[in-house]
Amino acid sequence: RLVPITRDIAEAPDVRDFVERYRQTLERELDQPVGRAEVPLDGREREVRSRETNLGDFVTDVMRERLGADLALLNGGAIRGNRLLPEGPITRRDLRQFLPFGNVLVLVEVRGAALGLALERAVSAYPRPAGAFLQVSGLHFRFDPSRSPGERVLDVTVRGRPLDPARAYTVALPDFLARGGDGYAMFGAARVLVPAPHGPGLVETLLDAVERRRS
């Protein structure tokens, strides 16, 4: 039968002590340094939702390398914590505060034309900060914020070559974007090469990359 949990139930000392020991162990693990930042890493909310940042560059570079993709995209809204991580040690807590959602990496294949639409979506709210703004790796693009949304992207290059609307590109994404989240319906309709159940965790991938760079 169901037992209601109310304030009338006395605290069990043995359970309390067990939970406290576990909490202390977890706190020590979270505060364990896993690497070092040679420069401050910018995870401030306004910045990651309106412009390229070095934290966004690092995360998307790791995503692209991990899945061997042509490029990687991460919505700025996936980065939380709203802070500038100072130069110095990076802990597990730091990385989990920046990426708290438990996202899994997905590899999809999309045409260049769909990527163009995605980039238009990314800058549609600019200069207003928006969670849909994309941090990117493997591509560069310019846009004109004075033009109407949907017509702002001027040119795009993927690994130094102009974006080909007809070509298929492989893209590393968090599962949220792969499901069409934040208005990215073109990814929800994309061909999936590595689905979420088989993809690596985003924060685990980042932890591994930071630890490898330390060694």
Which residues fall in each region the model found?
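Catalytic centers of hydrolytic enzymes
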Residues: 1-215
